[in-house]
Protein backbone atom coordinates (compact mmCIF):
# COMPACT_ATOMS: atom_id res chain seq x y z
CA UNK A 1 0.00 0.00 0.00
CA UNK A 2 1.35 3.44 -0.97
CA UNK A 3 2.07 6.17 1.56
CA UNK A 4 -1.10 8.03 0.62
CA UNK A 5 -3.13 4.82 0.64
CA UNK A 6 -1.75 3.90 4.06
CA UNK A 7 -2.62 7.33 5.44
CA UNK A 8 -6.17 7.13 4.08
CA UNK A 9 -6.54 3.63 5.54
CA UNK A 10 -5.37 4.80 8.98
CA UNK A 11 -7.64 7.85 8.88
CA UNK A 12 -10.66 5.75 7.94
CA UNK A 13 -9.98 3.09 10.59
CA UNK A 14 -9.34 5.78 13.23
CA UNK A 15 -12.68 7.46 12.50
CA UNK A 16 -14.46 4.11 12.37
CA UNK A 17 -13.04 2.81 15.65
CA UNK A 18 -13.67 6.02 17.59
CA UNK A 19 -17.20 6.41 16.20
CA UNK A 20 -18.14 2.89 17.28
CA UNK A 21 -16.33 3.40 20.60
CA UNK A 22 -18.57 6.38 21.37
CA UNK A 23 -21.60 4.33 20.34
CA UNK A 24 -20.74 1.63 22.86
CA UNK A 25 -19.89 4.25 25.51
CA UNK A 26 -23.45 5.53 25.10
CA UNK A 27 -24.81 2.02 25.48
CA UNK A 28 -22.91 1.47 28.73
CA UNK A 29 -23.83 4.88 30.14
CA UNK A 30 -27.54 4.47 29.39
CA UNK A 31 -27.54 0.88 30.63
CA UNK A 32 -25.93 1.66 33.98
CA UNK A 33 -27.85 4.88 34.70
CA UNK A 34 -31.18 3.31 33.73
CA UNK A 35 -30.45 0.19 35.79
CA UNK A 36 -29.75 2.32 38.86
CA UNK A 37 -32.66 4.73 38.36
CA UNK A 38 -35.42 2.56 36.90
CA UNK A 39 -34.40 -1.09 37.15
CA UNK A 40 -33.41 -3.69 34.58
CA UNK A 41 -36.86 -3.76 32.97
CA UNK A 42 -36.24 -0.33 31.42
CA UNK A 43 -32.69 -0.91 30.18
CA UNK A 44 -33.47 -2.09 26.65
CA UNK A 45 -35.65 0.90 25.82
CA UNK A 46 -32.84 3.20 26.95
CA UNK A 47 -30.08 1.53 24.92
CA UNK A 48 -31.96 0.35 21.82
CA UNK A 49 -30.84 2.98 19.28
CA UNK A 50 -27.14 3.24 20.21
CA UNK A 51 -27.00 -0.56 20.56
CA UNK A 52 -28.40 -1.05 17.07
CA UNK A 53 -25.99 1.52 15.64
CA UNK A 54 -22.88 0.18 17.36
CA UNK A 55 -23.59 -3.48 16.73
CA UNK A 56 -24.68 -3.05 13.12
CA UNK A 57 -21.58 -0.96 12.39
CA UNK A 58 -19.53 -4.03 13.32
CA UNK A 59 -20.66 -5.62 10.05
CA UNK A 60 -18.08 -3.41 8.35
CA UNK A 61 -15.35 -5.37 10.15
CA UNK A 62 -16.18 -8.38 8.01
CA UNK A 63 -15.67 -6.23 4.91
CA UNK A 64 -12.45 -4.82 6.38
CA UNK A 65 -11.08 -8.35 6.66
CA UNK A 66 -12.25 -9.36 3.18
CA UNK A 67 -10.58 -6.40 1.44
CA UNK A 68 -7.42 -6.57 3.55
CA UNK A 69 -7.83 -3.36 5.56
CA UNK A 70 -7.15 -5.34 8.74
CA UNK A 71 -5.36 -8.60 9.43
CA UNK A 72 -8.10 -10.17 11.54
CA UNK A 73 -9.20 -13.47 9.97
CA UNK A 74 -12.77 -13.38 8.67
CA UNK A 75 -13.22 -16.93 9.99
CA UNK A 76 -12.90 -15.56 13.54
CA UNK A 77 -14.76 -12.28 12.96
CA UNK A 78 -17.79 -13.60 11.08
CA UNK A 79 -19.24 -15.99 13.73
CA UNK A 80 -18.97 -13.46 16.54
CA UNK A 81 -20.43 -10.54 14.61
CA UNK A 82 -23.06 -12.77 13.01
CA UNK A 83 -24.28 -14.05 16.38
CA UNK A 84 -24.46 -10.53 17.79
CA UNK A 85 -26.39 -9.21 14.81
CA UNK A 86 -28.77 -12.14 15.21
CA UNK A 87 -29.31 -11.22 18.87
CA UNK A 88 -29.65 -7.50 18.16
CA UNK A 89 -32.14 -7.76 15.30
CA UNK A 90 -33.43 -11.34 15.23
CA UNK A 91 -34.16 -11.57 18.96
CA UNK A 92 -34.24 -8.23 20.78
CA UNK A 93 -35.74 -6.08 18.02
CA UNK A 94 -38.06 -8.81 16.77
CA UNK A 95 -39.44 -10.02 20.09
CA UNK A 96 -40.24 -7.19 22.53
CA UNK A 97 -41.33 -9.77 25.10
CA UNK A 98 -37.62 -10.30 25.90
CA UNK A 99 -36.93 -6.65 26.73
CA UNK A 100 -37.73 -6.71 30.43
CA UNK A 101 -35.56 -9.72 31.26
CA UNK A 102 -32.47 -9.26 33.44
CA UNK A 103 -30.38 -11.05 30.79
CA UNK A 104 -30.76 -8.02 28.50
CA UNK A 105 -28.88 -5.97 31.08
CA UNK A 106 -26.11 -8.53 31.52
CA UNK A 107 -25.86 -8.82 27.73
CA UNK A 108 -25.51 -5.12 26.94
CA UNK A 109 -23.14 -4.47 29.84
CA UNK A 110 -20.92 -7.42 28.85
CA UNK A 111 -20.93 -6.37 25.19
CA UNK A 112 -20.38 -2.68 25.86
CA UNK A 113 -17.44 -3.06 28.26
CA UNK A 114 -15.81 -5.51 25.85
CA UNK A 115 -16.27 -3.21 22.88
CA UNK A 116 -15.28 0.01 24.65
CA UNK A 117 -11.95 -1.62 25.45
CA UNK A 118 -11.55 -3.17 22.00
CA UNK A 119 -12.42 -0.11 19.93
CA UNK A 120 -10.36 2.26 22.09
CA UNK A 121 -7.41 -0.13 21.76
CA UNK A 122 -7.62 -0.19 17.96
CA UNK A 123 -8.48 3.51 17.86
CA UNK A 124 -5.30 4.32 19.78
CA UNK A 125 -3.21 2.09 17.52
CA UNK A 126 -4.58 3.61 14.31
CA UNK A 127 -4.51 7.21 15.57
CA UNK A 128 -1.25 7.27 17.51
CA UNK A 129 0.53 4.12 16.36
CA UNK A 130 0.50 2.49 19.79
CA UNK A 131 -1.75 1.58 22.70
CA UNK A 132 -0.74 1.82 26.38
CA UNK A 133 0.25 -1.42 28.07
CA UNK A 134 -2.67 -1.31 30.51
CA UNK A 135 -5.13 -1.07 27.63
CA UNK A 136 -3.44 -3.97 25.86
CA UNK A 137 -3.76 -6.02 29.04
CA UNK A 138 -7.46 -5.16 29.32
CA UNK A 139 -7.99 -5.94 25.63
CA UNK A 140 -6.60 -9.45 26.03
CA UNK A 141 -7.73 -10.27 29.59
CA UNK A 142 -11.25 -9.01 30.32
CA UNK A 143 -12.79 -11.50 27.88
CA UNK A 144 -12.10 -14.23 30.45
CA UNK A 145 -15.02 -12.84 32.47
CA UNK A 146 -17.03 -10.91 29.88
CA UNK A 147 -17.11 -13.60 27.18
CA UNK A 148 -18.82 -16.20 29.44
CA UNK A 149 -21.32 -13.63 30.77
CA UNK A 150 -22.06 -12.38 27.26
CA UNK A 151 -22.44 -15.84 25.76
CA UNK A 152 -24.63 -17.02 28.65
CA UNK A 153 -26.88 -14.00 28.14
CA UNK A 154 -27.08 -14.61 24.38
CA UNK A 155 -28.04 -18.26 24.83
CA UNK A 156 -30.55 -17.41 27.54
CA UNK A 157 -32.29 -14.74 25.47
CA UNK A 158 -32.58 -16.99 22.42
CA UNK A 159 -34.13 -19.67 24.63
CA UNK A 160 -36.52 -17.16 26.22
CA UNK A 161 -37.63 -15.96 22.77
CA UNK A 162 -38.43 -19.46 21.45
CA UNK A 163 -42.06 -19.62 22.70
CA UNK A 164 -42.79 -16.23 21.12
CA UNK A 165 -41.27 -17.37 17.84
CA UNK A 166 -43.54 -20.40 17.81
CA UNK A 167 -46.62 -18.44 18.84
CA UNK A 168 -46.22 -15.64 16.29
CA UNK A 169 -44.53 -17.65 13.51
CA UNK A 170 -42.57 -14.50 12.71
CA UNK A 171 -40.10 -14.94 9.82
CA UNK A 172 -41.58 -18.35 9.03
CA UNK A 173 -42.40 -19.49 5.51
CA UNK A 174 -45.03 -22.20 5.16
CA UNK A 175 -45.85 -24.55 2.31
CA UNK A 176 -47.33 -24.35 -0.20
CA UNK A 177 -45.65 -21.35 -1.81
CA UNK A 178 -44.19 -20.48 -5.19
CA UNK A 179 -40.67 -21.30 -4.04
CA UNK A 180 -41.70 -24.76 -2.80
CA UNK A 181 -39.67 -24.11 0.32
CA UNK A 182 -40.46 -23.84 4.03
CA UNK A 183 -38.56 -22.12 6.82
CA UNK A 184 -39.18 -22.09 10.56
CA UNK A 185 -37.38 -19.36 12.47
CA UNK A 186 -37.71 -21.19 15.79
CA UNK A 187 -35.95 -24.27 14.39
CA UNK A 188 -33.21 -22.07 12.93
CA UNK A 189 -32.80 -20.47 16.36
CA UNK A 190 -32.58 -23.88 18.03
CA UNK A 191 -29.89 -24.76 15.49
CA UNK A 192 -28.03 -21.59 16.44
CA UNK A 193 -28.14 -22.70 20.07
CA UNK A 194 -26.59 -26.01 19.03
CA UNK A 195 -23.78 -24.12 17.28
CA UNK A 196 -22.92 -22.38 20.55
CA UNK A 197 -21.96 -25.75 22.08
CA UNK A 198 -18.79 -26.31 20.00
CA UNK A 199 -18.45 -22.69 18.88
CA UNK A 200 -18.10 -21.01 22.28
CA UNK A 201 -15.25 -23.18 23.61
CA UNK A 202 -13.50 -22.87 20.23
CA UNK A 203 -13.68 -19.06 20.33
CA UNK A 204 -12.59 -18.95 23.97
CA UNK A 205 -9.58 -21.16 23.19
CA UNK A 206 -8.74 -18.97 20.19
CA UNK A 207 -8.85 -15.84 22.36
CA UNK A 208 -6.65 -17.46 25.00
CA UNK A 209 -4.07 -18.21 22.31
CA UNK A 210 -4.31 -14.62 21.05
CA UNK A 211 -3.83 -13.36 24.61
CA UNK A 212 -0.72 -15.45 25.14
CA UNK A 213 0.76 -14.26 21.85
CA UNK A 214 -0.06 -10.57 22.40
CA UNK A 215 1.18 -10.40 25.99
CA UNK A 216 4.37 -12.32 25.16
CA UNK A 217 5.07 -9.94 22.27
CA UNK A 218 4.49 -6.91 24.50
CA UNK A 219 6.77 -8.32 27.19
CA UNK A 220 9.56 -8.95 24.68
CA UNK A 221 9.30 -5.45 23.19
UniProtKB/Swiss-Prot annotation:
Q: Does the keyword Hydrolase apply?
A: no
Keywords, in A-Z order: Developmental protein, Endoplasmic reticulum, Fatty acid biosynthesis, Fatty acid metabolism, Lipid biosynthesis, Lipid metabolism, Lyase, Membrane, Transmembrane, Transmembrane helix
Catalytic activity annotation: a very-long-chain (3R)-3-hydroxyacyl-CoA = a very-long-chain (2E)-enoyl-CoA + H2O
Q: Kindly list the biological process annotations in GO that this record carries.
A: fatty acid elongation; sphingolipid biosynthetic process; very long-chain fatty acid biosynthetic process
- Which locations, inside or outside the cell, does it occupy? Endoplasmic reticulum membrane
**Which residue stretches are annotated as topological domain Lumenal?**
33-51, 96-100, 166-184
Q: Which InterPro entries does this one have?
A: Tyr_Pase-like_PTPLA
Which family, according to UniProt?
Belongs to the very long-chain fatty acids dehydratase HACD family.
Q: What does this protein do?
A: Catalyzes the third of the four reactions of the long-chain fatty acids elongation cycle. This endoplasmic reticulum-bound enzymatic process, allows the addition of two carbons to the chain of long- and very long-chain fatty acids/VLCFAs per cycle. This enzyme catalyzes the dehydration of the 3-hydroxyacyl-CoA intermediate into trans-2,3-enoyl-CoA, within each cycle of fatty acid elongation. Thereby, it participates in the production of VLCFAs of different chain lengths that are involved in multiple biological processes as precursors of membrane lipids and lipid mediators.
Identify this protein by name.
Answer: Very-long-chain (3R)-3-hydroxyacyl-CoA dehydratase PASTICCINO 2B
Organism whose genome encodes this protein: Oryza sativa subsp. japonica (Rice)
Question: What gene name is given for the protein in this entry?
Answer: PAS2B
Amino acid sequence: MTGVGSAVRRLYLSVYNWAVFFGWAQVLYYAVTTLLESGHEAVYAAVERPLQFAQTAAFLEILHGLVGLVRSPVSATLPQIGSRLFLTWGILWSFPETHSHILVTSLVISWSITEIIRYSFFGMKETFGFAPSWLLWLRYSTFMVLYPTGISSEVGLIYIALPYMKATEKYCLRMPNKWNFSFDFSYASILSLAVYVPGSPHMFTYMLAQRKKALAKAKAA
